[in-house]
Amino acid sequence: MRPLTEEETRVMFEKIAKYIGENLQLLVDRPDGTYCFRLHNDRVYYVSEKIMKLAANISGDKLVSLGTCFGKFTKTHKFRLHVTALDYLAPYAKYKVWIKPGAEQSFLYGNHVLKSGLGRITENTSQYQGVVVYSMADIPLGFGVAAKSTQDCRKVDPMAIVVFHQADIGEYVRHEETLT
């Protein structure tokens, strides 16, 4: 377990900023304590400093995880967000997409969101912008990347993809043995 290097921090913060923008500061400076990001086995964990100090007594090879896994670095040093970060990203999301009940199951199985399943989309969402996907009952289901801008979504055909799938809460079941 070690702090992130400057390059790792920059790559991770750029990825998170695609979803929550300048609200990134609210993740680190919280009123209930100081939180930080730590790297362990190529995975980035979001952990309170109090728990981090307790975990310092455990050897690195025995430590499985600590805090909440936000994502991992790939072998090419790109950062991939995990669905476990959804609970922390959803309240601060700038751009949101709501999908119809009929499209929820398709999204939770790992498929992209089609125009026919789109309920609402935040105004001024640009193309390739990170979005948090909600059900019509305002339950966060996952996150993705907008394939079309808000204006383009109005005039595309119903079978066009409007949100590229990145992660969803169905991964808890599909990848339960590898999710830490």
UniProtKB/Swiss-Prot annotation:
The keyword RNA-binding applies. Keywords: Nucleus, Ribosome biogenesis, RNA-binding. Required for proper 34S pre-rRNA processing and 60S ribosome subunit assembly. The keyword Nucleus applies. It comes from Homo sapiens (Human). Residues 93-180 are annotated as: C-terminal domain. Pfam families: pre-PUA_NIP7 (PF17833), UPF0113 (PF03657). Expressed in hematopoietic stem/progenitor cells. One of its GO terms (cellular component) is cytosol. PROSITE patterns: PUA. Residues 94-170 form the PUA domain. GO terms for biological process: ribosomal large subunit biogenesis; ribosome assembly. Residues 1-92 are annotated as: N-terminal domain. It comes from the Eukaryota. This is 60S ribosome subunit biogenesis protein NIP7 homolog. Its main location: nucleus.
